[in-house]
């Protein structure tokens, strides 16, 4: 069992607070916890940068923080794009032939709904429009196409949505055997599988961000609940696993934060702000 968040007594050195979104900052119903804007302001008053680190694209994350996106950092697309105060400071691109190969397999794999991520845009097959209710939560600008074959766009990530909530099974049995030597694959919960270039993950995104901020990884606090948070949790000085996370995640955190439905991230931020005063 991880020590409680109350055991972290070196909070005054923190300069960056990075949090995953789904099942970490957000409640189970996808709602933002009450008071998050006040906490971002409080961190800023003490020179501490707030960062949303997510598999979601930059546009969706900016819209999640309408009053603060110009004052915060965003690690989007699992580290494939990084923004600091609305400025793109890093981006990565997947080879076009390679993303077409992934899409071709996904199109022909039952239960797979592929999404080609192109920074603020996303491309989805017309046949999968029935899933728009879910997809639009994560992708604000969706273009539906009859086929991926003729697409020639810059892409930093491929995502696959699994309505059967069996992403790990599909990762192990279908996609990892085909691509894990050429791409980094990670599950984002039970319903999503993400593909980025090898070396691209939330951890690499945080590394790019701290380089631009001129701070050390030891001065970063990070919060997460699932597989795609592991690279970020493993490298920071203050890693918090949410109480609602699966037990295997405890190996990747130093402390246990209250659950997402208890606004656990905000509870720890309050302690960070108090230590900075």
Model-derived regions, located:
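Mg2+-dependent phosphoryl-transfer enzymes with acidic/Ser/Thr/Gly-rich catalytic loops
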Residues: 6-16, 32-33, 194-277
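Conserved acidic, metal-coordinating active-site core of Asp-based
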Residues: 101, 110-223, 227-231, 235, ...
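Short, structured coil segments at secondary-structure junctions
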Residues: 67-70, 78, 178-181, 235-236, ...
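Short hydrophobic/aromatic-enriched beta-strand-loop microsegments
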Residues: 71-77, 92, 135-136, 239-243, ...
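Active-site phosphate-binding/coordination module
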Residues: 29-131
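N-terminal glycine-/serine-/threonine-rich phosphate-binding loop
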Residues: 2-46, 50
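Hydrophobic packing residues within well-ordered alpha-helices of enzyme cores
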Residues: 36, 61-65, 171, 175, ...
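Residue-level signal for inorganic ion chemistry
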Residues: 43, 54, 78, 158, ...
């Amino acid at each position: 069992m991880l020590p409680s968040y109350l055991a972290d007594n070196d909070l005054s050195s923190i300069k960056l607070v990075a949090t995953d979104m789904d099942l970490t900052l957000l409640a189970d119903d996808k709602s933002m916890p009450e008071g998050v804007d006040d906490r971002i302001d409080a961190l800023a008053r003490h020179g501490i940068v707030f960062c949303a680190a997510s598999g979601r694209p930059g546009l969706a994350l900016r819209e999640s923080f309408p009053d603060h996106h110009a004052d915060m950092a965003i690690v989007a697309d699992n580290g494939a794009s990084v923004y600091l105060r609305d400025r793109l400071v890093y981006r990565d691109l997947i080879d076009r032939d390679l993303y077409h190969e992934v899409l071709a397999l996904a199109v022909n794999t039952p239960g797979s709904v592929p999404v080609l991520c192109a920074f603020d845009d996303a491309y989805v097959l017309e046949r999968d429009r029935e899933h728009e209710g879910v997809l639009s939560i994560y992708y604000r600008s969706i273009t539906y196409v009859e086929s991926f074959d003729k697409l020639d766009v810059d892409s930093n990530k491929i995502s696959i949505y699994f309505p059967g909530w069996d992403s790990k099974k599909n990762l192990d049995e279908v996609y990892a055997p085909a691509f894990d030597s050429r791409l980094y694959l990670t599950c984002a919960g039970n319903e999503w599988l993400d593909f980025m270039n090898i070396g691209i993950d939330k951890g690499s995104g945080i590394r790019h961000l701290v380089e631009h901020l001129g701070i050390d990884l030891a001065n970063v606090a990070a919060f997460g609940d699932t597989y795609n948070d592991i690279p970020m949790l493993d490298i920071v000085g203050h890693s918090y696993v949410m109480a609602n996370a699966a037990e295997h995640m405890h190996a990747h955190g130093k402390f246990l934060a209250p659950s997402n439905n208890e606004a656990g991230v905000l509870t720890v931020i309050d302690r960070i702000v108090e230590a900075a005063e």
